[in-house]
Amino acid sequence: MIYLRSSLLRSGLARDPARLCSQCFSRLSPSRRPVAVRSFFSSSRLRAGIADHESTPSTVQKTYFSANRTADGLLASLSAVNSSPRSIADNALSQGAASSESITSQSTSQELPHRRRKRLKEEAAKNNAAETELPPDASSQLSTLSSALPATSLRRKLAAFLALTKPRLSFLIVLTTTSAYGMYPISSLLTLDPSMTPLPTLSTSTLTFLYLTTGTFLSSCSANTLNMLLEPKYDALMSRTRNRPLVRGLLSRRAAVLFAIATAAAGLGLLYIGTNPTTTALSASNICLYAFVYTPLKRISVINTWVGAVVGGIPPLMGWTAAAGQTATTGHDSWRDMLFSKDSIGGWLLGGILFAWQFPHFNALSYMIREEYKAAGYRMLAWTNPAANARVALRYSLLMFPFSVGLWWVGVVGNGFLVGSTAANGWLVKEAYKFWRHQGANGSARRLFWASIWQLPILLVGGLVTKKGLWDGVWNNVFGQPVEDEDDYLWEDEDEVAEAERKMIPAKTSSS
């Protein structure tokens, strides 16, 4: 039996029947079929036994007479042989994928606890790697407005200088200062003795309020300008601050320095003239603390957040001491009397509220832009220790409750403030708890930030509305509570006068 060379079995040659003769194809046939010879003596049963499984075509075709008809079966067998490795490979791949999936599921089910925690932590970090960018602050918006104006325009310069002041932050400081001024108890004014000190009239209290408002705003402008002067290089690395006037070159450093000095001198001068030296000293200390302690400390230690909270807690004390200065008597108007007397407790409680509020507000803000703080080199808990960042926010949110209750306890506000402050503080604590629970993920940081934005004005306005003694007369008239009869005071005055006259008559007779 003669076999073909192995080269003839290659797929390329097998697919080209023109290069092989009929004898070679017949030898390559997998099963050699016996030739059916037509005979008069062969029956149909014998012919059926001789024929193979392939049925004879019912009609005579051209290929029936071809000598190479066996090539058809041979080519079909060769193509099946050539395609079999591919099918085997595909089956192997599908089986391998199925086995890998089963192995993966089995390994996941048998995953060790510490590896599972690590995997979940990495997945959470990937899902929450980037927060939505915050909108630009007021300084950036004013810088954009200034850059769009002509270079010689006066409006361009005014917008650039106003951008140095951080208008929103300055407005918040003025709001907290004037709120404390307005919450100073009316009872202190009612108990004054006109013979000892003149009562403050509407004109003097209004002037004091204007001096306090203007002086506080100018002092805040100076502190914010000094802050921008000390870190333009780092402001350029953050999206929220890279559009500030000194970063963009809208103002020179010399102009910014002169502006900071001028606003500080004007602000402190107005506070000294219109309020008292204690309020002026508090404002000056706040400028120095913010510009020369807090600003450089941001690149050194995470303690900068606590220093910044102290800066935020001083303005309510300024408003309280400004109001206390109007009722201070001669010899009782020193800084010790205004800051450490019994009447100063309300001011310290308001300062404590602002101190505690800084942490949920700033920790949520810093978490949303933690990568920018990290790139700029600012040491913030948001990226150095995110877990502690969330814990601190929750802890100081809870501290808002005792400070608010303390204002009611010492008689600064009425019962309505107790209800309103509990609701507002409860909202803040709820968002702070979610921020701690989710570690800033799932939008909890943004919700806490906006909750703090709304909670503080609600608290301050609520304190002004429910101020102790402000609505007593209205409350009594509406709810019909009995009012002490004025006739009782008249009868008491007549009795006192009659008794005094009886005492004076014997004295006159004895002298005569």
Swiss-Prot record:
This is Protoheme IX farnesyltransferase, mitochondrial. HAMAP family: CyoE_CtaB (MF_00154). Residues 97-111, 126-142 have a biased composition (Low complexity). The chain crosses the membrane at residues 171-191, 207-229, 255-275, 300-320, 345-365, 399-419, 448-468. Converts protoheme IX and farnesyl diphosphate to heme O. Keywords: Heme biosynthesis, Membrane, Mitochondrion, Transferase, Transit peptide, Transmembrane, Transmembrane helix. CDD domains: PT_UbiA_Cox10. Residues 1-47 form a transit peptide. One of its GO terms (biological process) is heme A biosynthetic process. It comes from the Eukaryota. One of its GO terms (molecular function) is protoheme IX farnesyltransferase activity. PANTHER family: PROTOHEME IX FARNESYLTRANSFERASE, MITOCHONDRIAL. It is found in: Mitochondrion membrane. Its EC number is 2.5.1.141. GO terms for cellular component: mitochondrial membrane; mitochondrion. Residues 91-116, 123-142 are annotated as: Disordered. Belongs to the UbiA prenyltransferase family. It catalyses: heme b + (2E,6E)-farnesyl diphosphate + H2O = Fe(II)-heme o + diphosphate. The lineage of its organism: Eukaryota, Fungi, Dikarya, Ascomycota, Pezizomycotina. It is a multi-pass membrane protein.
